[in-house]
């Protein structure tokens, strides 16, 4: 891989790596290598879901994908933004880079992987910069951090008489 990584630890592909919040939790607990849930051409199969259920016994339904390709892509873009923001704000990485890697997992045949929708999925993960969803999430971050304000006043006897004036003057100033 051409990317830097802090530790070779992280979740293997599975249902737990298909949702953004699970990827974020794994990151916060030290995961840095994320093998994303395997996606495939047949993203609308009707199978028992969740694919893995272990309430009293465990089973796994193969050839299953709980989210469509577009839903999977959206989850990975959300996670990507969240991890970058967390790292930038809280400096989790000691590297000059992000220190984590997303690794795609695709299946299950070459013919399936070569289909138009799978190829689009792969190419959009390789370079998301022109994808509308990536641009939308990038634009969500607002420049205005606070649009409202609360003015506090001392409540001694003299100030109580002038609170009305103070509110007017502070409101006009802001």
Model features per residue range: what roles?
Residues 3-10:
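Short, basic, glycine/proline-bearing loop/turn elements
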Residues 1, 13-174:
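Active-site entrance/lid segments in N-terminal catalytic domains of soluble metabolic enzymes
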